[in-house]
Each structure stands twice: as C-alpha cells, then as structure tokens.
Regions:
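C-terminal intrinsically disordered, low-complexity extensions immediately downstream
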Residues: 180, 187-210
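Glycine-rich ThDP/TPP pyrophosphate-binding loop and its adjacent helix/strand module
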Residues: 3-187
C-alpha cells in the first residue's frame, strides 16, 4: 500500500515549503487495512498536504464491501473519526469529481491539512482478467454500465456544442498512445535479475548497514 509513501511525500513537501500536494488513490477494500487508518491518523495529526481519493467501486476484489464493513461509507465514515472533513461524490460525474478535487487540493496547499474524497463508482470488469465477475448480479452490472462516465460526459460536451469529430480525435490519440506504450514495453529488454535488489537505500545500494 502507498499510504506511508504518500504521507512521506507530503511531509517532504511540508518540510521544504514547496507548496506541493500529494494525491493518493486507493480502493474501497484498502479501507479495511490497518495502514489506511495509521496513515489518516498521522496525516491529520501532522496536518500533511495530502489528499486521499477512495475509488469505491462496491467490491473488495470478489466481496461486496458492504458485507465486510460496518459503516455505509467505508472511507468517509472512517476518515471523519480521525478529524478529517471527508467528501462523498458521484465518481461517475466528471465535473463533480473535478470540483471537489480542486477544492481539496487547494485547501491542502494553503495549509488546511489532509482531505479524503470517496468517489462512488463501479468496476466494469472483474478484479483481473482471470475474473469473469460471475458473483455480481447482471442487473447490477447493467445498471452501472448505463452510467458509464465516458459516454455520459461525451453527451454533456456535445450538448454544449463540442464537435463530435474533435472528441473522436482525442479518443483516437489516447488509444494510439496506449497501443504504442504497450508495444514499446513488449519490445523492451527483460530486466536483469541483479536489479531486483538495487535502490533499497537512497544512495542506490542495498548492502545491509549496521
């Protein structure tokens, strides 16, 4: 989990006075892990410039988050107990997410301390390519797919006068960039085994130090 790294990054920015803000993304399942609670407590205590964004997609791998969590909002309800002022937002509403994120980042940058945003959304596919997702009701999947934020926001933009051809071109460029990155990764050399133990320490080494 990146919680500790996020707090470390935020502390570094606070110490150096750079005005930088760390943004840490997590899933709903991570809210049941001890490191999540430790990170929120430390961030609030030290008033770190960090924004935690929980993508609550309703499932903790293969388990509905509601069946293993005692509170209805697994991230926001916990964050409040650590002194944060959490925000719950429709994670499929592009502009709503943008607005709450901008506000949280602005507060953190201006000394307002950490923030947590719980974005309610849905995982369209399984947890991995090996997961067909049969444990989810078909009606539930169809309901959420109908709220897919990409076509929904495309409709918003075209309704405001954006040329559909421009949106097609943007989508094509994004797909091309992903395809290019995939091919470059496949064509690249395999990492050398000895690199697995480098950069353990800040100086790039890995030898044990007494």
């Amino acid at each position: 989990m990146l919680f500790r790294s996020a707090n470390g990054s935020a502390w570094s920015a606070l110490y150096r006075g750079t005005g930088q803000v760390t943004v840490c993304f997590l899933g709903d399942g991570a809210t049941n892990i001890g490191a999540f609670h430790e990170a929120l407590n430390l961030a609030a205590t030290w008033q770190l410039p960090v924004v935690f964004i929980c993508e609550n997609n309703q499932y903790m791998e293969y388990t509905p988050i509601g069946s293993v969590t005692a509170v209805p909002r697994p991230a926001a309800d916990r964050a409040a107990s650590y002194g944060l002022d959490p925000v719950v937002v429709d994670g499929n509403d592009v502009e709503a997410v943008y607005e709450v994120a901008q506000a949280a980042i602005g507060r953190a940058r201006n000394g307002g301390g950490p923030a947590l945003i719980e974005a309610l959304t849905y995982r369209h596919g399984g947890h991995s390519r090996a997961d067909p997702g049969k444990y989810r009701p078909d009606s539930e999947v169809k309901q959420w797919l109908a709220r897919d934020p990409l076509p929904a926001y495309r409709a918003v933009l075209t309704g405001r006068g954006t040329d559909p051809a421009l949106l097609d071109a943007i989508e094509a460029r994004a797909a091309e960039a992903v395809d290019l990155a995939t091919e470059e990764a496949k064509a690249g050399p395999q990492p050398r085994l000895e690199l697995a133990v480098t950069n353990v320490w800040a100086d790039g080494g890995h030898a044990w130090r007494n």
